[in-house]
Amino acid sequence: MTRGQFRAFVKETGHRTEPETDGQGAWGYDEDTKKIEGRKPKYSWRSTGFAQTEEHPVVNVTWNDANAFCRWLAQRSKRPIRLPTEAEWEYAARAGSAMRFYSGESPETLVKVGNVADGTAKKKFPDWQTTIAEDGYVFTAPVGQFLPNRLGLHDMLGNVWEWCQDWLGPYGDLSAKDPVRNEENQVRLMRGGGWGKRVPQISSSALRFSGAPPSRDMDVGFRVAFRAD
């Protein structure tokens, strides 16, 4: 979801994100020190330390904040909107492809479909090991700037990690149809990788990360899902 969409939610509901209310703040980039900083009250979804327009993905929101947005949008749109399950997310990311990477067989093809740590980022962070390609974005890119997958979905890899509904656990031994783990008080899954991940770290659509529901970061956002009519 974009900053503009999240701002509309905040304006209508008065919602304040956990980084804004718990006193811990969020992650951000300090232009003076040229460094990424851990949680500080001066950072939130509103202020990340790097330039973002309303078309950039919202970041520094927790799993709880993302679910609050989903409840609001579901009520407003009269649709059962929620965070995607991990199974739904991976199906959407792979888009029916049997290749190692949904963009092709080579990890270098990912620069065409996702905002990853590349030559542009290396100019800002010389110590980073990156690809030589340059996409023009050090941090987040506006939503939809890269090629879509076969389902017409943009940014399924790169740009921001995306919260899923599930909690993190090992895959089962048996096949299952849309499995979901949704118990309370468990670490929650994130999928997709963010702008700071490099090839080959981000090279597989199976890449997983996790965090407690109140976790927040400058490369973590979300998308929503609903059942088609």
Task: Annotate each predicted stretch with a short phrase.
Residues 2:
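Acidic-aromatic/histidine active-site loop/patch
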Residues 16, 21-209, 218:
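Functional-site microenvironments in short loops/helix caps that host divalent-cation chemistry
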Residues 218-229:
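Short, structured beta-strand segments at or near domain termini in extracellular proteins/domains
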Residues 11:
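Catalytic-histidine neighborhood of serine endopeptidases
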